[in-house]
């Protein structure tokens, strides 16, 4: 059950991100901004990753070289928070928004620790409750 909830959350997050990107490109004609993952030119992205001089761990979503997978940042840190799962992995979710709520989640050093203890606010506390089947 917990895997289903996490998978569903990831699917919704990715679908929303793809829809937003589509609408953004549709309204602005692509704008000339190269996506971080190089989706417009997969071969270029693949070459950049394969030819990386990283001697530690290369984050697949961002191409950053870090000490281990747990240090990989979210691809969109200004709008996402990284939530650690009980098994040591992590997922990136959209930051909670709303008056009096969103400011609490701006610091990446602490935003993953916040638990609003409210199932209507999707933060890392909610992710952990969902993982345990409590939501």
Swiss-Prot record:
Alphabetical list of InterPro entries matching this protein: LCL2
Domain of life (superkingdom): Eukaryota
Alphabetic keyword roster: Signal
Record's protein name: Long chronological lifespan protein 2
GO-annotated biological processes: ERAD pathway
Family: Belongs to the LCL2 family.
CDD domains reported in the protein's UniProt record: LCL2-like (cd23996)
Source organism of the structure: Candida tropicalis (strain ATCC MYA-3404 / T1)
Function: Probable component of the endoplasmic reticulum-associated degradation (ERAD) pathway.
Signal peptide stretch: 1-17
Name of the gene: LCL2
